[in-house]
Amino acid sequence: MEGEPFDRRLSRADMLRLAALAAGAGVVAGPTAAADAAVAHLTKESGRLQVMDWVGYVNDVPHHATYAAYLKKHPHNKPQFTHMASESDALGRFHAGAHPDLFRPYVGWVKYFAKSGLVQPWNPKLISNFKHLNPFMVKAGQYHGKQYGIPDDWGFDAILYRKDKVHPKARSWGLIFDDRYKGKIAWFDDIGMITVAGLYLKAKNPWNQTSAELDRSVNFLKKKIKLTKLLWAYESDLWQAFRGGDVWVAYAWPNDWVQMKKKFPVVYMHPREKPVAWVGMFMLLKGTPRPHLAHAYVDAWSSKHSGKWLEDNYGYGHANTQARPSSSQLLKALQLANPRAVTLPNAYLDRDIPQRALYAHLWEQVKASA
């Protein structure tokens, strides 16, 4: 793996300092411990680790296992969190001056951010759990042979519906466009809706549709958006609408199914056109002053223990292949034992959208037509 961008090259002055530190420490601890202590002293990073993450993942309480191991090793460096509503939202924040140490876009954005100059590759050698991560997902986080994304959580964009209220004609994305449920449908407020429309309408490549295909997808969405009750950006909004009976059918994620089945008889449908699979990818901001702390945080996220906790509490899959949830129902629903569950023939792994700016512009047109 190429690229260890922040592995510090020691200057002559550093070497002299290192020798002095090692000599002093060696009197007490021996040569190996002395060297470790000296390097640790030179690479010491200050300031709280800055993490930008999705709403719902930033529950910074001691029992939150996804970073409990990090807090155990760095008890005086509790991460400071900021929220992102989407990758586009994060990008806007970066351009406005935000500079967290790391953030977590999804796999379809890896190429975009790698090319943007905003991020730098990780050094997998500093992540002890890296060897346990799903190789297919690891490869999806690479660009030009460098590891720009570290995979952790994963799941599907699919359809959630109440089986006591909704009677699908087929296992299809068509359910979120079904005229019978006007006023009871929720879509995700994202350009991914254009991709899903392309899947449903059989575009050759829904992520890179031709002009004619885009016209068809966008016109279809403009017609069907009038069926919706809600365009959700935050899961809490979807849950509130679902719990209140305002929504019966939704474009949803596995965690939405986990939460809603506590109260309603719900089905998480695997559409015949296939769901869109996503993989969360931690990315390291270029020029971060805390690269080693960022690696420690991601290493904690990548552990078997963190993976099981995430699966049990959020209903998502985890890239650590050793992690298994307590629920056999979830194990089956996400096909967690299948290392290639996120790709064909089971699902389409989300990918780069070459015409991303155009898709975003067209999605705004769709919303304006409501």
What is each residue range found by the language model?
Residues Q240, R340-A370:
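Conserved C-terminal helix/tail region of periplasmic/extracytoplasmic solute-binding proteins
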Residues V39-Y112:
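Early extracytoplasmic/lumenal segment of secretory-pathway proteins
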Residues Y57-H63, R104-V110, A114-R243:
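Extracytoplasmic ligand-binding site segments that recognize negatively charged/polar headgroups
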